[in-house]
Regions:
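Long, terminal "pre-/pro-" and other extracytoplasmic accessory regions
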Residues: 1-147
Length: 147
């Protein structure tokens, strides 16, 4: 799957890909998150459907391939992003007792004309769920999985 996607210009996070087999074991579905510059695009998934060893269908959202299409501006550092997260949690009344993982990622926004931008985000995994802070504006972002 990964080699095929690379041939068509799509990088994926193979370590987090999910494979689901049919009850007979004759078919399977592979779903993976796309990458841009090594960072996951959290709302950009690609799915490959196989029957036996034959690829039947590729579906999902094709990520941008041009670095100039990513959002411009300087990204905030991790300490600033954590402070924004704490302020958001406090303002929202969420009770969070631990942050279990922090990482960089992107969110892809596509307009009706087909053009799009990649917005850098900080992703915080906590004991109450994942939260995303815009890496440029510091605002909380809502991420919906596209497939």
């Amino acid at each position: 799957s990964e080699n095929f996607l690379k041939k068509i210009g799509i990088d994926i996070d193979a370590d987090t890909a999910q494979v689901k087999y049919s009850s007979s074991g004759a078919s399977c579905t592979v779903t993976a998150m796309c990458l841009f510059e090594g960072r996951p695009i959290v709302n950009c998934l690609v799915t490959l459907n196989y029957s036996d060893t034959n690829l039947l269908l590729v579906s999902g959202t094709r990520p941008l391939t041009d670095a100039s299409e990513s959002a411009s501006g300087s990204e905030m550092d991790a300490a600033t992003a954590v402070m924004r997260l704490i302020a958001m949690l406090d303002d929202s009344g969420y009770l969070c007792s631990s942050i279990t993982d922090v990482g960089h990622c992107y969110k892809m926004d596509v307009s009706a004309s087909g053009t799009g931008t990649l917005t850098p985000l900080w992703r915080f995994s906590t004991d109450i769920g994942d939260f995303y802070i815009n890496g440029i504006t510091g605002k909380t972002e809502t991420v919906t999985q596209n497939n």
